[in-house]
Design a protein with these regions (language model features):
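Membrane-spanning beta-strands of outer-membrane beta-barrel proteins
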Residues: 18-20, 132, 206, 284
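Short, small/polar-rich motifs associated with maturation and membrane association
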Residues: 29, 117-118, 272, 282
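Conserved small-residue
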Residues: 1-3, 13-16, 30-127, 235-245, ...
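Outer-membrane beta-barrel transmembrane strand signature
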Residues: 5-13, 70-149, 187-203, 207-210, ...
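Structural signal for terminal/edge beta-strands and the immediately following C-terminal loop/tail
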Residues: 274-295
Length: 295
């Protein structure tokens, strides 16, 4: 727009259309007087029906150093939101460079980043950043003076780009001073960094999100204390997952790449889920002890 008229050089407008459909199921059951349980299951899918670019776009910049021109998430009309778009990794070549699959079987491998939308490109959906199923499971138990509340949670079917591995796993000569990431998926022979399915991991998880155990003391009749309870609470007690990154939680909004420890302004993207950025930290485990006394 005319900066002289409006005071700025661009405007934002709604230029796309999405369609989200899904199902949610909530079930509760009282097993007996001492045990009640409930479970919530949800599943949904979002399709991009209209977009300002008819042929689509590839978004979510991998970032610096050296991979600013690498984008990872496909946004295309008629496709589901969240497809992580990448060449399919096969092996490390004799020179340390990655060898990719000839996905379309035409006898040549076209895996350059700027060729992602060509008719002969060898790119595919290496995963999707949106879970196909999410669950929450609550349990309340009591026996004698004891009570237990346990809440489990899980997400399944989603993938994450492990950007820690993408940057710090290949043994690149210019990064010899780095502490290389060394997961079970690492390939020591790989000495060149190029984004591919190698760095896309299934991130299914099941965790004990919250556990509270409490004991109510018997109080003698006539005591100046009318009640006393001792409790212990653990948040993020355990997580079961095969994901090697910091946190398998779905990353439904990409905050964008960052430089010098800071996010680059204006890069947050709701159309690019599935990126585990290097700024993310491990989830903490919190243990709390409590004593409640009533007079």
């Amino acid at each position: 727009v005319d900066i002289a008229t409006y005071g700025f050089d661009r405007r934002f407008e709604n230029s796309g259309k999405i369609n989200t459909q899904g199902i949610e199921l909530n079930l509760g059951y009282e097993v007996n007087d001492n045990y009640q349980t409930s479970i919530n299951l949800s599943s949904y899918q979002t399709i991009l029906e209209e977009y300002v670019l008819e042929n689509g776009d590839i978004r979510a910049n991998l970032g610096a150093p050296g991979q600013n021109s690498t984008n990872m998430v496909l946004v295309r009309p008629g496709e589901v939101i969240g497809q992580i778009w990448a060449p399919r990794f096969q092996s490390a070549g004799a020179d340390g460079s990655p060898v990719f699959a000839d996905i379309n079987g035409d006898g040549q491998v076209v895996a350059a980043q700027d060729k992602w939308n060509d008719a002969d490109a060898d790119f595919e959906a290496a995963g999707n950043g949106v879970p196909t199923l999410e669950m929450g499971w609550s349990n309340n138990l009591s026996f004698g003076n004891w009570s237990v509340n346990a809440f489990f949670r899980g997400a399944f079917g989603h993938s994450l780009v492990n950007t820690f591995r993408a940057f710090y796993e290949p043994r690149i000569a210019s990064q010899s001073s780095y502490n290389f990431v060394n997961t079970s998926l690492a390939i020591p022979e790989l000495t060149a960094a190029q984004f591919s399915s190698l760095y896309v991991e299934k991130a299914d998880f099941f965790k004990l999100d919250n556990l509270t155990v409490a004991y109510n003391f018997n109080i003698a009749e006539g005591s100046f204390i009318t009640g006393a309870q001792l409790s212990a609470n653990v948040q993020n007690a355990f997580v079961i997952t095969n994901y090697t990154g910091t946190d398998p939680e779905p990353a439904l909004v990409d905050p964008g790449s960052y430089s010098g420890g800071n996010f680059v302004p204006g890069q947050g993207d709701v159309l690019a889920p599935g990126i585990d950025r290097r700024i993310n930290y491990f989830s903490s485990r919190t243990v709390t002890l409590g004593l409640n006394i009533n007079f």
